A protein has these predicted regions:
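Flexible, glycine/threonine- and acidic-rich loop/arm segments that mediate assembly and lattice contacts
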Residues: 1-242, 249-310
């Protein structure tokens, strides 16, 4: 008599199901772990940047204050607003599916809400770099980097070099020259490590330990964060396939330095709201939303090197 086949036996048994969902949609961004967030009242944060300092003069006995540039000029400022926007999506789960397909450690509603929350976090991280400030987007680092804060990479771009990194860090001055981070795409980080190996005998083991205990590479004591949300399809002077390296500072709570994420005081972080039953179908709706934004307090707290070809 023939033995039972695997196909037939499978009809009488179930495979073991692992609880949860294994992540397969991943974009590395080590920088997000250290980005500070500031809660604000209202939907916008206003702050003033120095434009022109009030002038002073060197004076001796009998010097009078008269005429232009005689110590009487007033300071001027530029008012800046960083607005909150909303990242949101609805998780809808059919009542029958929730009632009959939520065993084995996989609650259908919880899985869908978790997926929407992950999407919200990924959307923010993308906007942190690529947001253009138009429509409902907030301005990201590419948009926020001032024209005078760009390191020299030539008319058609350049490969990464130690000289570019040095100039990039020199442009960050709002904390008296302290630089809190360098961030680049994985492709550029590999090229940076190749530079170190080419030195011959140089160690590529310079690392910085983060508050959570993880270690990241470092340059001149400044942590380098891999961030794969940084595009590698930019164009400079006809050269395609370029990318950008950023360096800057993180705000320390004083609202005077570098960058900080923004969120609403009364609804900080990602919120999950039970909207209720759909009016015309057997669906329960949960709304996942995040009131968020990004502020660059000092323009001297962000610098970039665009046109990097590797």
């Amino acid at each position: 008599m023939a033995s039972v086949t695997l196909t037939e036996s499978a009809k009488l048994a179930q495979d073991e199901l692992v609880a949860g969902v294994i992540e397969n949609i991943i974009t590395v961004n080590r920088m997000f772990d250290v980005l500070p967030f500031d809660s604000i009242e209202g939907n916008s944060l206003a702050y003033n940047r120095e434009n022109v300092l009030g002038d002073v003069i060197m004076a001796g006995v009998g010097t009078t204050f008269s005429g232009a540039g005689a110590g009487k000029g007033a300071a001027t400022f530029t008012k800046v607003n960083s607005n909150l926007t909303t990242i949101m999506g609805d998780a809808e789960v059919n009542g029958l599916i929730q009632a009959t397909r939520s065993g084995d450690g996989n609650d259908q509603t919880a899985v869908q809400i978790a997926s929407k929350s992950k999407s919200a976090g990924r959307k923010y991280q993308d906007q942190l770099i690529n947001g253009n400030g138009a429509g409902n987007e907030f301005a990201g680092l590419i948009q926020l980097c001032a024209s005078g804060q760009t390191a020299t990479t030539g008319a058609t771009g350049s490969a990464i070099s130690f000289a570019i990194l040095d100039e990039l860090m020199d442009l960050v001055t709002d904390k008296d020259g302290q630089v809190d981070y360098i961030t680049m795409h994985a492709r550029t980080l590999r090229s940076y490590k190749a530079l170190l190996r080419a030195l011959g005998g140089a160690s590529i083991n310079e690392v910085v330990e983060l508050p959570g205990g993880a270690e990241v590479p470092a340059y001149s004591g400044t942590p380098i964060f891999r961030n794969d949300y940084i595009p590698t399809n930019q164009t400079k002077g006809g050269t395609t396939g370029c990318t950008t390296i950023f360096a800057g500072t993180l705000d320390d709570g004083s609202r005077t330095h570098g960058i900080a994420g923004l969120t609403a005081t009364q609804a900080a972080g990602i919120q999950v709201v039970d909207v209720g039953e759909s009016e015309d179908s057997d669906e329960h709706i949960w709304r996942v939303k995040w009131y968020c934004g990004l502020a660059l307090f000092s323009e001297k707290g962000l610098a970039c090197a665009d046109g990097i070809t590797n």
